[in-house]
Design a protein with these regions (language model features):
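Primarily recognizes the serine-hydrolase "nucleophile elbow" in alpha/beta-hydrolase
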Residues: 69, 119-194
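Catalytic histidine-centered segment of alpha/beta-hydrolase-like enzymes
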Residues: 288-297
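N-terminal cap/lid segment of alpha/beta-hydrolase-fold proteins
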Residues: 25-55, 106
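Mobile cap/lid helix-loop segments that gate and shape the active-site cleft of serine hydrolases
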Residues: 29, 40, 73, 151, ...
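Short amphipathic alpha-helix adjacent to the substrate-entry channel of hydrolases
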Residues: 74-95
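Short beta-strand element of the alpha/beta-hydrolase
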Residues: 57-67
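Short beta-strand/loop motif that positions the catalytic acidic residue
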Residues: 246, 252-254, 258
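Alpha/beta-hydrolase active-site loop
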Residues: 105-126, 301
Length: 315
């Protein structure tokens, strides 16, 4: 049996892990670290919550991801991004969501994490001081891809779900994605998968796309090696596959000289959104590669205005 003193110590440790840490910088906000938004394989899925002093009632999920790897080591760098600071300055509560990472998790498992975060945030909206029906999402590179998959493939509310938290919708109301992958079957050029593209550039990304299927014959998960089956995975996990007219408004920001995630990915996605009647824009970063430093002229305004327009109803 755990003693009273041991219990008190455990509670103190748990509270310390999620305590609000005042930020000494220019933007006035508090940071709550290591909030558990869900579980996977017995492990907690974590996020940090950044609450500005003057909240505007809306929230933006920042998908912490690069190369389908997510770690809190990236958060200090992310908090220095002008776009991140701008969200806080404008009163948005920012949820820095970390997902399961490759090589431990492959993409089919990774995409299941973001909806859990949305449901947790929406279910606890009052606790976070926001309106649960005014949620946006943003991310860069693989974070942008996961943000778009969430925007297009997330499910609505299921009133018959066993758990109350699963009865709320995992859909968001707006998305902004920086240089995202969108079509993993035709990545840069037709009939070239995302993995083939990465391999052609000497990039090691196999673990992300190491797909497996359950085999009743062997009673274990077997690696998918058949080309047609692999293409089905790529297709089903591509954001472009799931575009429908009821998707949230999407802004894509992409560099024309991006060799890692070709500019074509942003173009084809925005074209299909337009065809489906989904409000969308493509901010063209002329001459820019896969990421850049100082924001371009009009970039930060486009980023903030998108969320203001669709989450705050500002014209």
């Amino acid at each position: 049996m755990m003693s009273h003193s041991s219990t008190a110590t455990l509670v103190a440790l748990l509270l310390a892990a999620t305590i609000a840490v005042p930020n000494p910088g220019a933007a006035e906000y508090t940071q709550q670290e290591n909030i558990v938004y869900g579980h996977k394989d017995g492990l907690g899925l974590l996020m940090d919550v950044f609450t500005p002093r003057k909240q505007n009632g809306a929230g933006v999920i920042w998908t912490v991801s690069g190369g389908m790897n997510s770690s809190r080591r990236a958060i200090p760098r992310i908090t220095k991004f002008p776009s991140f600071r701008a969200l806080l300055d404008k009163g948005y509560t920012v949820f820095a969501v970390m997902h399961g990472s490759q090589p431990r998790s492959e993409l089919e498992e990774i995409v299941k994490d973001m909806p859990k975060a949305v449901r947790h945030i929406r279910f606890n909206a009052k606790r976070y001081g926001i309106d649960g029906d005014r949620l946006g999402v943003t991310g860069r590179s693989s974070g942008g891809q996961l943000s778009l998959y969430l925007a297009t493939a997330a499910e609505g509310a299921n009133p018959n779900a066993k758990q109350p938290i699963d009865r709320v919708s995992s859909r968001v109301q707006a998305a902004v994605a920086y240089f995202p992958g969108t079509d993993m079957v035709h990545f840069g050029k037709r009939d070239t998968t995302i993995l083939e593209h990465f391999r052609s550039r000497g990039m090691k990304a196999d673990a992300t796309f190491d797909f497996h299927k359950w085999s009743p014959e062997t009673s274990r998960f077997e690696r998918v090696t058949d080309r047609r089956e692999q293409l089905k995975f790529y297709r089903d996990l591509s954001p472009i596959t799931h575009i429908t007219p009821d998707d949230p408004p999407v802004l894509i920001i992409h560099g024309t000289d991006d060799k890692i995630v070709p500019f074509q990915q942003g173009e084809v996605f925005q074209a299909k959104l337009k065809k489906a009647g989904v409000p969308s824009e493509l901010f063209v970063a002329k001459g820019k590669k896969h990421g850049w430093g100082k924001p371009l002229d009009g970039e930060l305004k486009a980023f903030i205005d998108w969320f203001d327009r669709h989450l705050l109803n500002k014209k």
